[in-house]
From Swiss-Prot:
Belongs to the complex I 49 kDa subunit family. InterPro entries: NDH1_su_D/H (IPR022885), NiFe-Hase_large (IPR029014). The keyword Cell membrane does not apply. The keyword Electron transport applies. PANTHER family: NADH DEHYDROGENASE [UBIQUINONE] IRON-SULFUR PROTEIN 2, MITOCHONDRIAL, NADH-UBIQUINONE OXIDOREDUCTASE 49 KDA SUBUNIT. Keywords: Electron transport, Membrane, Mitochondrion, Mitochondrion inner membrane, NAD, Oxidoreductase, Respiratory chain, Translocase, Transport, Ubiquinone. GO terms for cellular component: mitochondrial inner membrane. It catalyses: a ubiquinone + NADH + 5 H(+)(in) = a ubiquinol + NAD(+) + 4 H(+)(out). The gene is NAD7. One of its GO terms (molecular function) is NADH dehydrogenase (ubiquinone) activity. It is a peripheral membrane protein. This is NADH dehydrogenase [ubiquinone] iron-sulfur protein 2. It comes from Solanum tuberosum.
Amino acid sequence: MTTKNRQIQNFTLNFGPQHPAAHGVLRLVLEMNGEVVERAEPHIGLL
């Protein structure tokens, strides 16, 4: 397969939530392009 025929797409990564006993529970929904974060959607609050 050549690189001309390859289709590259972003992928979504769920990061968190961290430990429930930690202060300021945070969950991030990250849209990644390789190792680069294209978009980050924070979800702050309770589990």
